[in-house]
From Swiss-Prot:
The keyword Membrane does not apply. Residues 127-136 have a biased composition (Basic residues). This is Nitrogen permease regulator 3. One of its GO terms (cellular component) is GATOR1 complex. Mediates inactivation of the TORC1 complex in response to amino acid starvation. Required for meiotic nuclear division. Residues 1-21 form the signal peptide. Residues 49-59, 139-151, 169-203 have a biased composition (Basic and acidic residues).
Length: 828
């Protein structure tokens, strides 16, 4: 079994409730879960666990178990099971199922003691009805010598005469019994025909009157099963799953909270109204508690809607998850809300118990009680992979297990799928299947809400049939919306044409409703400029011959179905626009209707265009050279700036050093003092003064030279450190970019940008180089940046034309201008 095919694996539905008296089974559907034959655990392997011992044997009345070892001629010598024989001699078991054709039943019997007693009673009654057979068998099985010594020839004659008389009586009784059975079968056939005419074929009519809520469920007592399916409060209000006898019992048990409510209390931001209200509430508390105490004896504390499943082993987890997510949780939460508001489940529980007290039949409960009807409709719809439209306390709850009929890639030839499925890689978010990734589901939902107005709706059935199936009045807004839909118009255009009658939000709601109910699917608006091809998933081996006659009857003036497909997908030519196969303008409407019919039944898909940005090797080399030239120019500019700053710093430091030296100040002061003293004292001191001046001037010169040399050394060291740091930073950036360029050049001849909307720095340089090389105009540059993030091979250009309101002519000009730098692919 493939996940592409619907397989609910739903066996039955149980509704378990728990009161202060204990858990009990309130309702089950189907009613004949006991008589259904499934591959249960063999009896010889059963009872190995302590919790399953009572399913095979009962500790009470162990003496009656000796009857199991009584030998009967009707027992199978290998298995020991009691067999019956039809008129043709074929064996059957006690429920009328052929043992040879149903080996599971004979080899996998897993019954209770009550069923064994019933089997023995039926066998005993059969032996009493035909005593001659068993007497004859007993006599024939005795020892021949003992018969010869104990009986003579006369006794043998009497036995033969007695056997002959008994055979005659048996033949008469057999004829009468066959006549009665024939009459009963005729009556049953008449009842079945009446039931089929009424549309109720869910229950076999041979045992309608014998169904009881106390019947065993797959060999288990209802009381024992209810104990398992009634978990404590700590395990309620969450997913509950238990496996018993290869059957999975799945549900969401709802338990009453300690404060008596069923739903979680919502946080309220209202301010308290004052002490008076609180005092009034305190006064009412005692009386309310007294009323609750008086009614809790028979009140409902827990209810559990249980879905019994038997999925394949390879799909067990997948089928259980989808059943819980789409059906079990939605239905249980709807019941919880109804119970919280109007005590819906509690009232239905009392009504069902009252009906059973009045000896109402189990098959008649769903005709008068809404809860029983809800469970029945849910089972009949979900088990047949249909949508369940349930009514819970006057409110509609819609449940369905999503069916995968939309594929974004072609399945393997060995993988089965639903006939008339279609391929579409652009609108996969409109499908409702297997979105286990929550984040992806949120993104898909956002995309759906934003983009659905850009698509058109293709109805999957005739409009009047949809109105009839969904019980919609033709004159209602929804009915008018369905009648006015056309697959060649997007919902945006539909809103603009019918703005007086429909709001955009209303149109979006109607569209989502039709998609959910599988009455329509979202497609690209049909256009004569688009290209359509035959679908590789077309059901050419199953439905082709039927559809050929249907297509010819529907469109008598159009080519036949095979010829139409041949025109769309010629064998030796590339597919052309749809306008090329329309003979004239008068045939336009009929050809569009035929195209819509072919798309609806999965014969045709639209061919879409996807684009990637391609960066050739020469453009990457050019960008690399430009980056190297920019780095070299930046380095020269930095060296020039640092050189000018170093020269200015050297001259200033020398002057400042000479002026601010403390030794220089001391020497100058001493020299001036001595000169003035010599002038005052006379000529005797002239020789000394000249000597002092010469000595002081030499010292001043040597001091200035030392200071200048020290300052120049400090400036040179600072300049070298700055230049080295800047050079290292520039070299690290250059090396990093060179590594990226080397990888891109070496890896491939051409590079494709996968996500242009999140391009790196280097990829942006490539994109800017494309714009400069192609010499795009300002208008084309604006269109280019508008479409840039969609050039990822995931979004078709046909969709961008509608969403971004770009004309086909402008798009054609842009693609022609950048044709050397794009890779285009055409597929579904």
């Amino acid at each position: 079994m493939s996940r592409n095919l619907p397989n609910p694996s739903l066996v039955g539905i149980l509704f378990v409730v728990s009161t202060h008296s204990g858990p009990q089974l309130l309702y089950k559907y189907p009613h004949n879960l006991t008589d259904r034959v499934f591959s249960l655990v063999p009896r010889k392997h059963a009872g190995t666990e302590d919790g399953m011992q009572h399913l095979v044997r009962d500790d009470k009345d162990d003496d009656d178990d000796d009857e199991l070892y009584e030998y009967n001629e009707d027992e199978d010598p290998e298995s020991g099971d009691l067999l019956f024989f039809d008129k043709d001699g074929t064996s059957r078991d006690r429920s009328g199922i052929n043992v040879i054709s149903d080996t599971n039943h004979s080899q996998y019997y897993y019954g209770t003691k009550l069923e064994l007693k019933r089997t023995l009673d039926e066998g005993r009654a059969l032996r009493r009805a035909t005593p001659h057979k068993y007497n004859h068998n007993r006599l024939s099985t005795e020892h021949p010598k003992r018969n010869e010594h104990s009986q003579g020839s006369k006794s043998r004659r009497s036995i033969r005469n007695t056997d002959t008389t008994q055979d005659d009586n048996y033949q008469k009784q057999k004829g009468q019994q066959e006549g009665r059975e024939k009459k009963d079968k005729d009556k049953e056939k008449e009842k079945e025909k009446d039931a089929e005419e009424k549309g109720d074929v869910s229950e076999p009519h041979s045992a309608v009157d014998t169904f009881s809520i106390a019947d065993d469920i797959f060999g288990m007592a209802p009381g024992y099963l209810c104990e398992i399916l009634s978990p404590p409060r700590q395990m309620c209000n969450t997913r509950y799953e238990v496996t018993i006898q290869d059957k999975i019992f799945l549900g969401l048990p709802i338990h009453q909270h300690a404060d008596g409510t069923w739903t979680n209390a919502r946080s309220s931001k209202r301010s308290q109204s004052g002490r008076s209200n609180s005092l009034h509430f305190e006064n009412l508390t005692s009386s309310t508690e007294a009323q609750l105490a008086s009614t809790t004896a028979q009140s409902l504390t827990m209810f559990h809607l249980v879905f019994i499943m038997n999925p394949p082993a390879t799909e067990c987890s997948y089928r259980i998850d989808e059943m819980f997510q789409h059906v079990a949780s939605r239905t249980s939460l709807g019941l919880r809300l109804a119970q919280q508001k109007h005590n819906y489940v509690g009232n239905q529980m009392k009504a069902i118990q009252r009906a059973r007290e009045q000896e109402c039949k189990e098959v008649d409960l769903d005709k008068t009680l809404s809860l029983c009807k809800l469970i029945k409709e849910c089972y009949l719809a979900i088990s047949t992979s249909r949508i369940a439209n349930l009514e819970i306390d006057g409110k509609q709850v819609v449940c369905q297990i999503p069916t995968k009929y939309e594929f974004d890639s072609l399945p393997e030839p060995s993988v089965p799928y639903i006939p008339r499925s279609f391929l579409s890689s652009s609108i996969h978010s409109f499908g409702m299947w297997d979105r286990s990734n929550i984040e992806q589901q949120k993104l898909d939902d956002d995309f759906l809400q934003e983009s659905i107005m850009c698509f058109a709706l293709l109805l999957l059935a005739e409009p009047h049939n949809i109105l009839q199936d969904m019980n919609i009045v033709t004159n209602s807004p929804f009915g008018k919306f369905i009648m006015l839909l056309h697959p060649s118009e997007s919902l945006l255009k539909f809103c603009s044409k019918n703005s007086q009658h429909f709001e955009p939000s209303e149109v979006k709601s109607y569209a989502l409703h039709l998609i959910y109910w599988k009455k329509a699917r979202a497609i690209q608006p049909l256009s004569s400029r688009s290209v359509y091809v035959a679908s590789p998933m077309a059901s050419l081996t199953t439905k082709l011959f039927e559809d050929i006659y249907r297509f010819k009857a529907r469109f008598p003036m159009s080519p036949s179905l095979p010829q139409f497909l041949k025109l769309l997908s010629p064998q030796l030519k590339k597919p052309q626009q749809f306008a090329s196969i329309i003979p004239s303008r008068d045939h336009r409407a009929s050809y569009f209707e035929a195209l819509a019919w072919l798309i609806r039944f999965g014969y045709v898909n639209q061919q879409l265009t996807f684009v990637w940005l391609k960066i050739p090797k020469n453009l990457r080399v050019k960008v690399e050279e430009d980056m190297e030239n920019e780095d070299a120019l930046l380095k020269r500019n930095k060296d020039r700036v640092f050189g000018e700053k170093s020269q200015t710093t050297d001259n200033t430091s020398k002057t400042m050093a000479v002026q601010e030296s403390p030794h220089n100040n001391d020497i100058t002061t001493t020299r001036d003092t001595k000169i003035s003293n010599n002038r005052n004292n006379g000529s005797d001191f002239d020789t000394d003064a000249d000597a002092n001046v010469n000595v002081n001037s030499d010292a001043n010169t040597s001091t200035n030279a030392a200071v200048a040399n020290t300052a120049a050394g400090l400036v040179d060291a600072r300049k070298d450190s700055l230049i080295n740091a800047t050079t290292e930073t520039t070299e690290s950036q250059t090396e990093r970019l060179k590594k990226q360029l080397t990888l891109s050049v070496v890896d491939d001849e051409d590079t494709i940008i996968l996500e242009p909307g999140r391009a790196s720095t280097l990829e942006r340089r490539w994109i800017n180089e494309i714009i400069s090389v192609c010499k795009l105009s300002h208008d084309l540059i604006a269109i280019f940046y508008k479409l840039l993030k969609f050039m990822n091979g995931k979004t078709p250009l046909e969709f961008l034309i509608i969403k971004n309101e770009i004309s086909r002519l402008d798009l054609k000009k842009l693609l022609y201008a950048i044709g050397n730098y794009i890779v285009s692919v055409r597929h579904w």
